[in-house]
C-alpha cells in the first residue's frame, strides 16, 4: 500500500471498537435502525453548580463532517482489507463484518446507503429537541446507522463552541446596549485567541469557524479556510484581525527600552488599529507614564479608525481592567455618552485577553457598568476557554436509536435508566415543528405525519453518499442571529 493510500481517511476505522461487533447483536431480521441526535435537557441539575444555563443550542458543523468524511466513494477494496487486518489483530478474532462492507462496495460503489435529516445549520434550538436523524436506506445495512454515530457525534464540538460563543454575545449585547444605547461593533467584542490552546490543527479550524458564526474577530487563521471550503461566504474572508504586539516583540528591546518598543510599534502601524501588550513589566506604569505621558502625543494624534488598543495580560481580569481604565481616564480626556457612561477618546481602547471565559466576562462587564464605564471602551480575547475548555457533557450531546424494523414490523424503542431520568431517550420516528406560539416541539412515534403540526423542520442533507442540501456561512450566521427582544432586552 503506498503512503498516500495509507494516509487516506478510512471510515471503516473511524468508529468505536465495540461497534465493529454490533451487526451480530441486533435482533435477527432487523432491516432498519433509525437514530437521532439531541442536546439533552438536564431537568434535575442543581442550578447552583453552573452559572450559565445553556437553554438553547446553535446547530453547526454537521455539513463539514458530511462533506469531509462521508460523501462520495468512501468504501474501497483496499480499505476493507486494511480494516479486516487491523480488527483481526485488535480483537484477536475474526469479528469484522467483511461481507456487509463488500455489499456496500459492490451494490453502491462504496457510497453509504444512509439518509441524514437535520435542522438548518445555524438554527438556535432549545435543549431536548431532535437536531438530526440517521437511518439506513438499504435493509441489508441496518448496522451502518450506528456505525457512523462516532463521527457524527463529533459535531458536539462545533455545536458547543458556537453555543458558548453566542451566550457570550448575549452578555456583551445586553451590557453594550445598556451602557451605550446601541450595538455598534458588537461582532468585534470577543476575539478568538485560541489557536495555540486547542488540541490540533483540525480542532482549530472547526472551533474558529464555530466562533465566527457569532463574531467577526479571530486570530485563528485555520477557521477561514474551513469556512471557505465547506460553507462559502459572500465576503472574501469571514474573519478579521489587526496588527498586534506579543511579549517577545516588546521584551526583545530590553527592560529599559519598553518605551522605545511601544513607540516603534505604534509608528509602524500608524493608520490602522494596533494592539500593544503592555504588562511585560508593569501594566500600570505603562498606562500612566509611557502611554499617558511619554508617548501621549503619538496617541492623541491617531484617528478614530486607527486607535491604540492597550492589552493587559495578567492579574485579576476585573481588577486589572478597572484599574487600567481608571488610569487612562485620568491621563486622557473622558466624555460621557448619552446613557451617562464614561467613554475614552476614540483613539484609545482596551482589550482584555487573559483569563476570559463566560463567567469572568460577565463579571468584568458588570463591574464596568457599576463603575459607570461604557462597554464601548473594551473588547475581549478568549482562547482556551473559547475553543478547548468544553466537553460533550456541557450540552449533553447524545445519539440514540429510537426506531427499528424487525421482521417487517416497526417498533418504537427507547432507553430509560432507573438511576438517571435525564438519560431517558425519545421513541419512534421523530420530527421537529414550530408551534403556533413560535416555540419548538419534537414529535415522537411518527406523529409529525399528522398534518395539523405543519411541516417538519428536519431536511434531508445527505442521502446515499450525496450531500443533498448545503448552507452558506451567511445563511448560518443569519440563522444564529440574536433575537433582540428575547436575547438582549434587560430582563
From Swiss-Prot:
Name assigned to this protein: Nicotinamide phosphoribosyltransferase
Gene that specifies this protein: Nampt
Phosphotyrosine modifications at: 188
Pfam family, one: NAMPT_N
EC number: 2.4.2.12
Residue positions binding diphosphate: 196, 247, 311
Modified residues (N-acetylmethionine): 1
Residues at which beta-nicotinamide D-ribonucleotide binds: 219, 311-313, 353-354, 384, 392
Record-linked Gene3D superfamilies: Aldolase class I (3.20.20.70)
Entry-linked InterPro entries: Aldolase_TIM, DUF5598, N/Namide_PRibTrfase, Nicotinamide_PRibTrfase, Nicotinate_pribotase-like_C
GO cellular component, one term: nucleus
Broad EC category: transferase
Phosphoserine sites (modified residues): 472
Tissue-wise expression: Expressed in various tissues. At the highest level in liver and at the second highest in heart. The amount is higher in heart than in lung.
NCBIfam families, sorted: PRK09198.1
Predominant cellular place of this UniProt entry's protein: nucleus
